[in-house]
Amino acid sequence: MKNLKGIFSALLVSFNEDGSINEKGLREIVRYNIDKMKIDGLYVGGSTGENFMLSTAEKKEIFRIAKEEAKDQVALIAQVGSVNLHEAVELGKYATELGYDSLSAVTPFYYKFSFAEIKHYYETIIAETGNNMIVYSIPFLTGVNMGVEQFGELYANPKVLGVKFTAGDFYLLERLKKAYPNHLVWAGFDEMMLPAVSLGVDGAIGSTFNVNGLRARQIFELAKAGKVAEALEIQHVTNDLIEGILANGLYLTIKEILKLQGVNAGYCREPMTAKATEKQLAVAKELKEKFL
């Protein structure tokens, strides 16, 4: 297994205008992340990949393409979580066969699952695949809030490496790192990387790293070295960029910026807005020229 610490891009997926996967474009996005953004790894099949709007077959295709293009150049994490446990297991087996370094799974959502049910979900995926697991905690979208003791129950399984922590509860983050220092934490909010690194996270997984990965690494390494003031200046610039991206449409804007960099990033998957308006295109161009 490769080192899973450091900067991981939450991989975008290029779609054609009809919603089908644009394989050439996806390969270009993978290459751009590795060759230009110099990332340590890719988190494939997450929210940024518009995963929850895709069929099982499409998810598998994305895992295959990303692995073929990345080869063994960087670490690869496959997000296989689903409200359908059978699908999660099927995807987990497939990604494991492809050679992904670890699986990750979002907490089951929509229905109000008990913690016992959530624990069973993770235990089942691990038992059926034999691969490592990274819990994907994103409470503001799933409604699932777990405390230190509940994470501890999940961590009792030696295959659970840690958590992708996409939450603003930094008290919980600090308590987790203190209670379980040997378990990894990846920061999930790009705009709060500096305080997260100050609290001891081991890496970060972010959507904006597809275009802002070099700055993300600077923040991470400066903060780790105790150069907080320098890291803060870069975080300020990063957050100005993120503010502009969010106001213009997150995934769509990142894709348009990539296109301006010569990457065939394609369209978004409906029911998201698939194609940028002239105004959105102008904003993307302005952000690229100002920040990248």
Swiss-Prot record:
GO terms for molecular function: N-acetylneuraminate lyase activity. Its EC number is 4.1.3.3. It is found in: Cytoplasm. PROSITE patterns: DHDPS_1 (PS00665), DHDPS_2 (PS00666). Pathway: Amino-sugar metabolism; N-acetylneuraminate degradation; D-fructose 6-phosphate from N-acetylneuraminate: step 1/5. Aceneuramate binds at residues 47-48, 166, 188, 190-191, 207. One of its GO terms (biological process) is carbohydrate metabolic process. Keywords: Carbohydrate metabolism, Cytoplasm, Lyase, Schiff base. GO terms for cellular component: cytosol. Its main location: cytoplasm. InterPro entries: Aldolase_TIM, DapA-like, NanA, Schiff_base-form_aldolases_AS, Schiff_base-form_aldolases_CS. Homotetramer. Catalyzes the reversible aldol cleavage of N-acetylneuraminic acid (sialic acid; Neu5Ac) to form pyruvate and N-acetylmannosamine (ManNAc) via a Schiff base intermediate. Belongs to the DapA family. NanA subfamily. This is N-acetylneuraminate lyase. The lineage of its organism: Bacteria, Pseudomonadati, Pseudomonadota, Gammaproteobacteria, Pasteurellales. The gene is nanA.
